[in-house]
């Protein structure tokens, strides 16, 4: 199976790109969705997180208090490493299972941390959806309702844009309209079909 890693910073257009590929009949494995699934109520990772951090990470219904945990890990690199040590191996295993089950001509692995988590090791080619920091902040603040400061912290925690550009095999600049994004994706889709 030919696997294309798709990455980009917050607000870059990863979701728009992955949805376009899905409309072309290409299966998409989304690392963010997998990451949410592995910490659902009843999943072993959730129990490990509560043991490592304390019950404050749980809401009254037993689900993960994502916002509180996110704020905590952005303030504490040590806590972030603890969380990643618990979740990353479980996430990787689930991603591999989903990639292996794909039946489309190729499969897309969407991951905002494709390089940071070494998920690029699972791919044959890597596509960066790129946007300027100003565009990223504008899109993410409109979409998520987060403060500019919180979005800047997220951007700062991710691999620098220039490094992602160096590591990517293909780069799509998404500073404009969706029509322009889709035009660039059409050419890449044809290349990926002919891998």
From Swiss-Prot:
Instruction: Cite the DPCK domain residue spans from the record.
Output: 3-195
- Which residues are noted in the entry as ATP-binding? 11-16
- InterPro entries, per the entry: Depp_CoAkinase, P-loop_NTPase
Where in or outside the cell? Cytoplasm
Q: Does the keyword Iron apply?
A: no
Q: Which Gene3D superfamilies does this entry report, sorted A to Z?
A: P-loop containing nucleotide triphosphate hydrolases
- One Pfam match: CoaE
Main location as per UniProt: cytoplasm
Q: What are the GO cellular component annotations? A: cytoplasm
Q: For this UniProt record, give its keywords in alphabetical order, as a comma-separated list.
A: ATP-binding, Coenzyme A biosynthesis, Cytoplasm, Kinase, Nucleotide-binding, Transferase
Give the similarity note. Belongs to the CoaE family.
Q: What does this protein do?
A: Catalyzes the phosphorylation of the 3'-hydroxyl group of dephosphocoenzyme A to form coenzyme A.
* Protein name (database record): Dephospho-CoA kinase
Gene field: coaE
């Amino acid at each position: 199976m030919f696997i294309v890693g798709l990455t980009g910073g917050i607000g870059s257009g990863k979701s728009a790109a992955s949805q376009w590929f899905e409309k072309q009949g290409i299966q998409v494995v989304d690392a963010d969705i997998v990451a949410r699934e592995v910490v659902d109520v009843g999943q072993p990772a959730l129990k490990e997180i509560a043991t490592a951090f304390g019950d404050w990470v749980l809401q009254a219904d037993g689900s993960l208090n994502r916002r509180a945990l996110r704020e905590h890990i952005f303030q504490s690199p040590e806590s972030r490493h603890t969380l990643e040590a618990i979740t990353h191996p479980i996430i990787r295993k689930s991603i591999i299972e989903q990639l292996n089950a794909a039946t489309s001509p190729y499969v897309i692995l969407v991951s905002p941390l494709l390089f940071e988590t070494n998920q690029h090791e699972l791919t044959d080619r890597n596509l960066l959806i790129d946007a300027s920091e100003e565009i990223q902040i504008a899109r993410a603040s409109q979409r998520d309702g987060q403060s500019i400061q919180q979005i800047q912290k997220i951007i700062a925690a991710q691999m620098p844009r220039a490094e992602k550009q160096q590591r990517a095999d293909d780069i799509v600049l998404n500073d404009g309209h969706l029509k322009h994004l889709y035009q660039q994706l059409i050419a890449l889709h044809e290349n990926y079909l002919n891998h």
